[in-house]
């Protein structure tokens, strides 16, 4: 089990050039690159940036959107942990929030040779050590198709969907 103090997370947070920002209860880290200044500038308004982007998914618990700030395009996701059950939130008392966990896992996948969108920034809000909000910002993968579009274009999409479900279950277990 990874904790908020795991060496893998510390390595990601302390990469050369990564900038950390603390704004009230928001803890926010932006990796080095041409995106850094633009993504640092949106920290105080991150909720509005995501909500007003090109929304790809919106639910009570999360919003995912394609966004552009100062000519920098990115994918951003906001997970609202306050909409989740308390016991679910409690596990993140010692574990990193999903945004930081995603950054660490993406790094592992990239080193293993599995291309995954590069994490540009990650952040979370905590109240009394419990995650209330989690933010992940990645590069946009141009030309990527949604799973829905890909499945609908396949002649045996029912079987493909079933197999995809089995694979997803294995990945999440």
Tell me what each language-model feature is.
Residues 2-54:
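Juxta-kinase regulatory segment immediately upstream of eukaryotic protein kinase catalytic domains
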Residues 38-146, 155, 163-173:
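Conserved ATP-binding subdomain of kinase catalytic cores across diverse folds
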